[in-house]
Amino acid sequence: MARAKFERTKPHVNVGTIGHVDHGKTTLTAAITMTLAAQGKAQARKYDEIDAAPEEKARGITINTAHVEYETEKRHYAHVDCPGHADYVKNMITGAAQMDGAILVVAATDGAMPQTKEHILLARQVGVPSIVVFLNKVDMVDDEELLELVELELRELLNEYEFPGDEVPIIRGSGLKALEAMTANPKTLRGENEWVDKIYELMDAVDNYIPTPERDVDKPFLMAVEDVFSITGRGTVATGRIERGRIKLNETVELVGLRETRTTTVTGIEMFKKSLEEGIAGDNAGLLLRGLKKEDVERGMVIAKPGSITPHTKFEGEVYVLTEKEGGRKTPFFAGYRPQFYVRTTDVTGTITSFTSDDGSAAEMVMPGDRIKMTVELIQPIAIEQGMRFAIREGGRTIGAGVVSKIIE
């Protein structure tokens, strides 16, 4: 078992394929698994296995997502691929499958298409940090100038959405040709087939260009309060799941949201009725807070490293509005609509002041099934930050899912 243990030391990165329908995302995903399986670094997955993506629920929304995993010399990857366009929209907005980087698949025969643009825009809005491009189906294009033109257009498009279009690696290849080569001889290694080599070239780009994300435990401490108790003779305990960072005894923290920010000291950390010296990301813990009464703390506040997060009331969000079939509204809504925004552990009422379409023009109303950018004003300040996910609820049921794309005030 020594081998398995050794591999756990590789950094883990979450990636996904994005791009226009029928440009070859799933074929490429299958080709990557089969190519790396020849080195024993992946389980080979056929196209049909990936395409028949199981349904999952994220924030009450059903999404079809396929997950595959593989590794390179440098890293371990979890890779997500979605069968339908709506699944991508929902996946990226809910953050159901977090992406530290994306592989944008573009067919050389078509160039950039509407969903290519939409996926780049979404990646920008939801905070996908890096994109690597795979120019697919190049075996079907004889004209070198045409390929260069498509690349140029893609770089301009990436720049337009604030990705460094001039630096983004663009790898030319053919997912299908690589898949055919690997199917004919599953033991094909690097240097034995030109199309398989393109898959290795792509993985090199992913390895080297997509930065290793900072681990949750290394980020500034944050825990959203779920419940508050009073323990006679000891004080007030707030419970919740530590979202990121670590907390040690006697560290100073801030209580942020709903009221004036307050500073306090953590005098006890408990988990499963046992005292701990330290709590880390992922732990469900109870924190004993010095000098606070039970009524000073409420669900929806966050306990965080001082200065790391601030309360806000106005933000812009990229939102997917559920269809009636998904349990959402039957009717459209307009600016001035006042639903609840469920953030981390609590609902806060807010007014949607305006809607913006992808082209920057104002939209009058929003229909179930739409994706839209909206400006929201909450009635109480809460701890929010760019990239944070939220749900929109009406009478306790979810009618939309969103991500904060910009803080206004």
UniProtKB/Swiss-Prot annotation:
It is an enzyme of class 3 (hydrolase). PROSITE patterns: G_TR_1, G_TR_2. Its EC number is 3.6.5.3. Pfam families: GTP_EFTU (PF00009), GTP_EFTU_D2 (PF03144), GTP_EFTU_D3 (PF03143). The keyword Plastid does not apply. GO terms for cellular component: cytosol. The keyword DNA-binding does not apply. Mg(2+) binds at residue 26. Signal peptide: none annotated. Residues 19-26 are annotated as: G1. Residues 10-214 form the tr-type G domain. Residues 60-64 are annotated as: G2. Residues 136-139 are annotated as: G4. It is found in: Cytoplasm. Residues 81-84 are annotated as: G3. Monomer. Belongs to the TRAFAC class translation factor GTPase superfamily. Classic translation factor GTPase family. EF-Tu/EF-1A subfamily. This is Elongation factor Tu. It comes from Thermosynechococcus vestitus (strain NIES-2133 / IAM M-273 / BP-1). The gene is tuf.
